Amino acid sequence: MSTSLVIDTSTSRTIVGLVKDEQVIWQGFHDGATDHGNAVAILAKQALAAGVNPDRVVVGMGPGPFTGLRVGISFARAFAAARNIEVIGICSLDAIVVDQSSYTVAIDARRKEIYWAKYHDGVRVEGPAVNFPADVDGYIIDLYPDVLRLVQLSHSQNVSEPVYLRRPDAVATADRP
């Protein structure tokens, strides 16, 4: 089996965990939409203090706010490169665990919008997408990605690029319309 350092910064919560052979060794989080940069390093250090060395990194690839995603993905890639281990990307919405047959998960997209996806029996059937909450049918569940679920999904998916569903707020002058 494997030992995974798990990182997700797709929501206002920075999530870091250490999972060995499908057992959570350590997990922690920090709430703060503008503090991912500090939080991910502190949480990763705490995870590594458990004394178990990861042989791969599993990272949530969004959807999520541009800056938050970049922080987590960049940290994951740099950590993996320094240790010469693989990085596996996961759609963060897929890692939100819900005990229902049909449901919609959503996370705050700011600007009064949500990133959302619909699921049936744990399989994504629609999305991810970004809309106003009133434009999304169904009961919306607002939770956070689960560390163990991110690792479980790493056996069946590998998202190579961040899931950005809209342009960032800040763009280079040359790229402005």
Language-model features: locations:
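Phosphate/pyrophosphate-binding loops at sites that engage ATP/ADP/AMP, CoA/4′-phosphopantetheine
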Residues: 44-56
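DPxDG-like acidic metal-binding loop motif
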Residues: 56-87
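Oxyanion-binding and handling regions
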Residues: 1-24, 31-39, 82-177
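A short glycine/serine-rich beta->alpha loop
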Residues: 27-32, 61-65
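Short glycine-rich phosphate-binding loop at a beta-alpha junction
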Residues: 53-62, 136-142
